[in-house]
Curated annotation (Swiss-Prot):
GO terms for cellular component: ribonucleoprotein complex; ribosome. NCBIfam families: rplX_bact (TIGR01079). SMART domains: KOW. This is Large ribosomal subunit protein uL24. One of its GO terms (biological process) is translation. It comes from Orientia tsutsugamushi (strain Ikeda) (Rickettsia tsutsugamushi).
Length: 105
């Protein structure tokens, strides 16, 4: 299992696969599967059956999970992809730091 350094709300870029180069915001992190769901990325058409409660059926687009190794964090200051590292501030609190810019995330 990979160490998950990307959190919900982070902007990421797809670095491999059919959506390579596209950017989006992380909606959900599936830590047990080492996958993330990114808004507008890895869309699939799903057929939905009509419901008795009045929900109409049809075809909807849905985001599918992407493996964590196929996305990279986008540094907000430089707008480039970067790696993330952890360090302790004052020996107490663990914070995420961008390796490219050195800023606290």
């Amino acid at each position: 299992m990979l160490k998950i350094r990307i959190k919900t709300g982070d902007q990421v870029q797809v670095i491999t696969g059919k959506d390579k180069g596209k950017r989006g915001i992380v909606i959900k992190v599936l830590a047990n599967l080492s996958k993330v769901i990114v808004k507008g990325i890895n869309l699939a058409q799903k057929h939905v059956k009509a419901n008795k409660n009045g929900v109409s059926g049809g075809i909807i687009s849905k985001e599918l999970p992407i493996h964590i190794s196929n996305v990279a964090y986008v540094d907000s200051s430089s707008n480039l992809i970067t790696k993330i590292t952890y360090t302790k501030l004052d020996g107490k609190r663990k914070v995420r730091i961008s390796k490219r810019s050195g800023e606290i995330l």
